[in-house]
Amino acid sequence: MKIFDCFPFFNEIPLLDMRLNYLNKIVDKFVIVEGTHSHQGKLKKLYYDENKSLFKKYENKIIHIIQNSYPNHLGDTHSNFIYDYHTRNGISKGLKKCLDDDIILISDVDEFPDVDKFSLFNGNLTIFKQLMFYFKFNLRVKNFDHDNGDGLWPGTRMLNFKMFKNMTNVQKIRNTKVKKYAWWRFD
């Protein structure tokens, strides 16, 4: 069984460095999906490619996926979400060699799961509820719409590859167990 940490990447170089360093001892592969377009549909440079020398010590663990095809929805009311979702969907391109029992983490680059909670994983889709911070670690958010006021962000998703391949059953998502205080998010 291997652990694959999967996330879209825009340009958050310091957060990427923190994430790779923090999860390096437990993760077998990092699947970094970088789009050629911003969430607004504008062309963007590939920041990971420009800075990959900074991450040389992780190069044998990194699978860098370049998402370069997008639906033509620029100008639609929700086009920013369409570009974001389409980039995130590129994660599957980096999981071609996975086995059914491999563990898949799906996050944003700024969502840091508590690795001590990984042992609680029982094969069901799991959502880590994470502490959330804005801009600095002393600016914790304690009340926002996603969490009924408990200051926890529904962040990292953990599931096995067998479930990932068959993500058509919405009921499995509804039955998710939430791990409280399973780490933090830094925006």
Per-segment meaning from a language model:
Residues 5-10, 33-34, 106-109, 128-131:
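Short His-Asn-centered micro-motif
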Residues 3, 28, 102, 110, ...:
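Conserved acidic residues
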Residues 31, 63-65, 105, 126, ...:
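Hydrophobic/aromatic beta-strand patches that form the interior of the parallel beta-sheet core
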Residues 3, 24-38, 59-63:
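Short loop->beta transition adjacent to catalytic acidic/histidine clusters or analogous donor-positioning motifs
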Residues 37-106, 115-116:
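Active-site-proximal specificity loops/subdomain of glycosyltransferases
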Residues 111-187:
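Conserved catalytic core of nucleotide-sugar-dependent glycosyltransferases
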Residues 19-28, 118-125:
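Short, surface-exposed basic-aromatic patches at helix termini and helix-loop junctions that form
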Residues 1-25:
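N-proximal low-complexity "stem/linker" segments adjacent to membrane-targeting elements
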